[in-house]
Amino acid sequence: MKPENKSPVLDLISAGMKTVVNTLQPDLPPWPATGTIAEQRQYYTLERRFWNAGAPEMATRAYMVPTKYGQVETRLFCPQPDSPATLFYLHGGGFILGNLDTHDRIMRVLASYSQCTVIGIDYTLSPEARFPQAIEEIVAACCYFHQQAEDYQINMSRIGFAGDSAGAMLALASALWLRDKQIDCGKIAGVLLWYGLYGLRDSVTRRLLGGVWDGLTQQDLQMYEEAYLSNDADRESPYYCLFNNDLTREVPPCFIAGAEFDPLLDDSRLLYQTLAAHQQPCEFKLYPGTLHAFLHYSRMMKTADEALRDGAQFFTAQL
């Protein structure tokens, strides 16, 4: 679609979202659009520091977890000693960016609202790691903490997965992987999915929306996919195109959050409609006036805080 035909998104977003978009960080250099992935990762980490400030304080612990690919860093957020469940968080960033620091506030707020232990998994990024390595690392971390739950003093009898954007895909893919391969890591009580991509290759929202403001043009999405997948056949894998998996049975309860002006919104809508059509427990909530990645901005934006609270409440209601 010609760029001129796209929706005038920046004119339509909410006042709170406009405040975020217009918030300048004077000490921050321009985004290195033509830089290396390493430079873009460094910039992303620096840019997120401002938005992570003032997060809830709580006990945190860091552990390296063994996987067949090597050690993977994890970070535990413990809001109380007697947690009712453990929630594994997978950060977004198009599979190529992000880490435990860039999503620190999101995990802390989620832990605070749910009063559950939250474990962030710093899966290996692409293109260094190709599908399905990230999923296998996540599953390995779940198995490790399930086996060592007593030593780490965490409750692994009930677990959940949560993620934003690419992390939402990884969250649901990991839950389906455990189901399909009959791996016991505790009862999966729920999956929390904020503005994820789940396998659509084209849609109305992908055509109408997306631009330099969110890094989700058709070209951007293609670049993320090419970095993540090992080959063309992976596009149809039931752990990448999740609509090719069996969504008619034993899908854990899903909280599906959509951003109104997100090119990936139709992915969330289709996931919800598919699950609902087959009586799988799910809830869909649309957050008006928001852009993709709005969850990061709870320091300034009430809607972001609300979306985290909604997800936490959905999860605790399943326990």
UniProtKB/Swiss-Prot annotation:
Organism name: Escherichia coli (strain ATCC 8739 / DSM 1576 / NBRC 3972 / NCIMB 8545 / WDCM 00012 / Crooks)
The reply on keyword RNA-binding is no
Q: Does the keyword DNA-binding apply?
A: no
Q: What is its main location?
A: cytoplasm
Q: Where is this motif: Involved in the stabilization of the negatively charged intermediate by the formation of the oxyanion hole?
A: 91-93
Q: What is the lineage of its organism?
A: Bacteria, Pseudomonadati, Pseudomonadota, Gammaproteobacteria, Enterobacterales
EC category? hydrolase
The identity of this protein, by name, is: Acetyl esterase
Quote the cellular component terms of the Gene Ontology held in the record.
cytoplasm
Q: Which NCBIfam families match?
A: PRK10162.1
Span of the signal peptide:
none
PROSITE patterns, per this entry?
A: LIPASE_GDXG_HIS, LIPASE_GDXG_SER
A GO MF annotation of the entry reads: carboxylic ester hydrolase activity
**Gene3D superfamilies (UniProt xref):** alpha/beta hydrolase
Q: Name one Pfam family in it.
A: Abhydrolase_3
